[in-house]
Design a protein with these regions (language model features):
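ATP-dependent adenylate-handling active sites, centered on carboxylate activation for C-N bond formation
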Residues: 1-172
Length: 172
């Protein structure tokens, strides 16, 4: 319950805006939770300063790949009754654009940020100037198995090491 209140409060604060709000929606837990929180705040906090023009979901689509979560994102937008914009991401990004994005991020990531950059570009083209997104929830809650292993250096004793090991094994 405490996490829920903190999460809703964090979203509510970020919805204070006098410009159009949107969100990058993948259909995963983090972005779905964010847009559902925005919907909840809009319905239940009418007297607050939260922006009422937030119903814009932008979805990066990767047809025919394991990365495509379009059907999950559509379920969320249908459930909430909000607009969605689907943007098919072309895997043949020009070299110049790829290099520009590398320059912007100043580092090489395990996966290029091309989809995110293209999605934000589309948001801007369609009039959304602020995007409230759910990035990094997987990392925050150890959604990736390898993140659990990062807890080993902080373990105090065998009991905590065993707990970390069990958390890792239970994810697999």
């Amino acid at each position: 319950e405490q996490f829920r209140e903190l999460f809703l409060d964090a979203c509510k604060i970020r919805m204070r805006s006098d410009v159009t709000l949107g969100t990058g929606l993948s259909g995963g837990l983090d972005s779905s939770a964010t847009i559902c929180a925005m919907s909840y705040i809009s319905r239940n906090c009418a007297d607050e300063r939260a922006n009422k023009d937030w119903q814009h979901a932008y979805v990066a689509c990767f047809p025919g790949t394991d990365l495509d979560e379009t059907k999950y994102a559509k379920q969320v937008t249908d459930y909430l009754g909000i607009r969605h914009t689907f943007l098919t991401i072309d895997d043949a990004v020009p070299e110049r654009e790829f290099l520009r994005q590398l320059y912007c991020f100043e580092e090489l990531w395990g996966n290029p940020q091309v989809p995110m950059m293209e999605l934000y570009k589309k948001e801007r083209e369609l009039g959304t100037t602020v995007s409230l997104d759910g990035h990094a929830a997987d990392e925050l809650f150890a959604g990736y198995g390898f993140d659990v292993l990062k807890a080993y250096p902080d373990a105090k004793g065998k009991a905590e090491i065993d707990q970390i090991t069990m958390a890792y094994l239970n994810q697999r």
